Amino acid sequence: MKVKLLVLAVVGMLAVAAAASAARLDVIYGTAGADTLAGTTGADVIYARAGGDTVRGRAGNDVLYGGAGNDVMWPGSGVDVQYGGTGNDVLHALANDNQPDILDCGPGFDTAIVIEHDPARFRGCEQILRLSPEEAAALAASGGDS
């Protein structure tokens, strides 16, 4: 399995984006610091590891691992699985694609933010916020990968 990584910047934190791939699964690893990691439009597995990370899965059926630290996860469309790990994490399911995402928040005080009537399933989330499609679109545009 080939993994292609494009390092965008290294200034106190690592920002990484994977090269697009439709025919294979891309695996992306973060560092012990505060990383910004982004997947492709295909299926990705992203391991953020330690640090307060921002993880963007983009389109495709993705698996996102937050690790230690206060992480923020933004999966895209598709059937996505998010594991928050330790820390106070924020997991999103805002794609409005009617897919059964899984949000496993983990230890810490974690928040899941989803579109109302989304079929997402939750585990270990202390707070679940349900937004209207309009509110979700505005939030995704302001902080997610639109």
Task: Indicate residue ranges for each PLM-predicted region.
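N-terminal signal peptide c-region/cleavage motif recognized by signal peptidases
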Residues: A17-A19
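Bacterial N-terminal signal peptides
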Residues: L8-A15
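Composition-driven, intrinsically disordered low-complexity tracts enriched in small residues
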Residues: A138-S146
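N-terminal segments that cap or nucleate solenoid repeat domains
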Residues: A22-R58
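Bacterial N-terminal signal peptides that target proteins for export
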Residues: M1-V7
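Glycine-centered beta-turn/loop sites at beta-strand termini
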Residues: G30, G39, A48, G57, ...
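Leucine-rich solenoid repeat scaffolds
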Residues: L94-A136
